Amino acid sequence: MQEAAAEKALVLCSGGADSSTLLAMAVEKYGPENVFALSISYGQKHSREIQSAAAVAEHYGVEQRFLDLAAIFAESDCSLLEHSEREVPCESYAEQLEEAGGAPVSTYVPFRNGLFLSSAASMALSLGCSVMFYGAHHDEWAGNAYPDCSPEFVQAMASAIEQGTGGQLRMEAPFVAWNKAQIVKRGLELGVPYELTWSCYEGGERPCGVCGTCRDRIAAFDANGVVDPLMR
């Protein structure tokens, strides 16, 4: 009897702590030869996270693909985008939400994750994958900070992808009920090379340590009793 082909997986990998942990989990389950990492440029103010995504993919020995979708966001004034004159906020998600009165935070790129997931689904299917992974987590959607990270959004996109591919592809988002500290805990267990990752909204040699994403990342490592390797 002919042996069944191994299942292949695609992981959306930004180069940050969350998606790098997700990549490690996929590699553990499917083996590096059966995992693809997809990294997407969207016109962000620096390329540091894409460089980190490449380093993490190389570390795990997985094939990597890149997409550039910057043109789609050319009309957006999101503070993360290179053409925007808005300052990237230094407040935590919770503080930003309080200021925004429950509206999405200023670093919300309009429907970015919907576009990312649709693009990833097309690429995953073309690469012969039967599963794709998305690293949205609780801290991102709590209080409507990023509505395209919410459980409702994840469920809707998972259904659309399954229906739109005729059941050939499924989407999994295992972190949607986890906070960042829980993700880091799992990553530490797996030996994720967090020193290769990048989360900061700035693109310097070292993280700024004060922007919202730096503060949340530092707190996640602190909650696990360790120092973020990028802050040593």
Model-found features: residue ranges?
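ATP-dependent adenylation/nucleotidyltransferase module used to activate substrates
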Residues: 2-191
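Residue-level recognition of conserved structural "scaffold" positions that shape functional pockets
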Residues: 22-23, 216, 232
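A polyampholytic, Gly/Pro-enriched intrinsically disordered region
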Residues: 88-89, 192, 218-223
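Local cysteine-cluster metal-coordination motifs and their immediate loop/turn environment
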Residues: 118, 198-219
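Short amphipathic alpha-helical interaction/hinge segments
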Residues: 165, 222-225
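Short, intrinsically disordered, charge-biased short linear motifs at domain edges
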Residues: 187-189, 194-203
